[in-house]
């Protein structure tokens, strides 16, 4: 048994864990490890927004263009594709890329082909919406948790190895305790979301300034290789409860501190669904996320179901990654997206 916080990220605690040192978790879980040379990662969500079947072909082509741009110099180490329909009735395709070198990401983002495509007048006139939501947490600003040990998705794919069984899981507050920065920092939000360019109500190009310790969670489910019993467990028991919780946050998350919640399904380049899904949640703070997970009936049902089945999982793959980041390490840009998209809903617009 080992600590979730890797040796080179440990420091003298000024903030205590939620459990005593002799705590033993009820089942095995693991996390992704990186060597001490990893200083920061980039989690980049590139979206294409459209409405209805008439725009689907154009949206898929735009998605494929983004994927093709990943093959340019300094592209990401891994990526995946998703679809979801939001509560305003718009379809959204998201290409998610991960970099383990923020300088490489910066060079890629500023490269002539990538920059020219985003800046083109065509983006304003082709009838689609686009967004970029990018966070670059430092090594001490994110944690991961896996119920399996191979082929890690998401940020795990750019890490170096899997841990041994970890101590910090299976209790309320364990998410926070897995953050290396939690040893000395409460990870409190530093300000509010602010629109710094454009007007969400008018469409066009809009830029939102984030804030320190804005929290991003990706919580995933992969039943592609699961056999009949586990597929039934996921589709008939876990998924309905999970869907209820995710829909609740999507529709009612604002007063809870949830800026945006998207329950997405993985797809291939042609838009065909895969048996993989995950939730993308942006929150004001870790504390706001904790408060919901520990108290809301929908999440309590999810938690109870997971606890009941976790020890027996074979090919059903469940995981999550949670990060905070500094405002200077965030990018939130939107082009012709409806005003409920992503950070637009809760961002404050400065008086004219």
From Swiss-Prot:
Disulfide bonds: none annotated. It catalyses: an aliphatic aldoxime = a nitrile + H2O. It holds the Pfam family Dehydratase_hem. Keywords: Heme, Iron, Lyase, Metal-binding. The active site is at residue 320. One of its GO terms (molecular function) is lyase activity. InterPro entries: Dimeric_a/b-barrel, OXD. It is an enzyme of class 4 (lyase). Homodimer. Belongs to the heme-containing dehydratase family. This is Aliphatic aldoxime dehydratase.
